[in-house]
């Protein structure tokens, strides 16, 4: 089988800068991932992630949520756009919309998200400030399968960073993002190699059910 046919197809959804998208594009280009990014789709016209896609000659699709009357209508159109690329995997990389249950169900077990906290702590926004305000000594990032509840799907991998005294959230965010750019391509690689799957709302790697905090490297 030609190499190109063995590669998995990924569609990445972004709303902003797309630094994780860039890490994924680079990993594919360097043959570190047995995959190709088939398209990048954004709900924001000015998302720099769209420019990153164009720079890499990847189809960049802007789908404006403000022109739809309901979340369900938007998600139906989003589903149609994604389906034209026949992806094996959907990757949320800073996609700042809550997805409707029907959309999530359609891609069950084939959609990943990265969230800047040690889930189940700090679902939602402003995670870095919340970790600092709580006096946490460690913070981090989680990659998880997407389920209908926000930031609630089974965790695949977490990475921790220390929280220093007098820490400001921007600096903490930067250190978390360094971890993100290493972790996300790794988890995507596991998926593309057929090593990672979700069943019964649990994540499995190499046939082994993962712990609540995901794969433990230590």
Predicted regions located by residue number:
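Short, basic/aromatic-enriched C-terminal tail that caps enzymatic domains
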Residues: 22, 200-218
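Donor/substrate-binding cores of folate-linked one-carbon enzymes
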Residues: 27, 43, 89, 93-206
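Glycine-rich, highly charged phosphate/nucleotide-binding loops
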Residues: 66-79
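Short beta->alpha connector loops at strand-helix junctions that form conserved
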Residues: 61-66, 114
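Glycine-rich phosphate-binding loop signature in dinucleotide/nucleotide-binding domains
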Residues: 81-87
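Short, structured coil segments at secondary-structure junctions
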Residues: 56-57, 107
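N-terminal Rossmann-like dinucleotide-binding module
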Residues: 1-48, 52
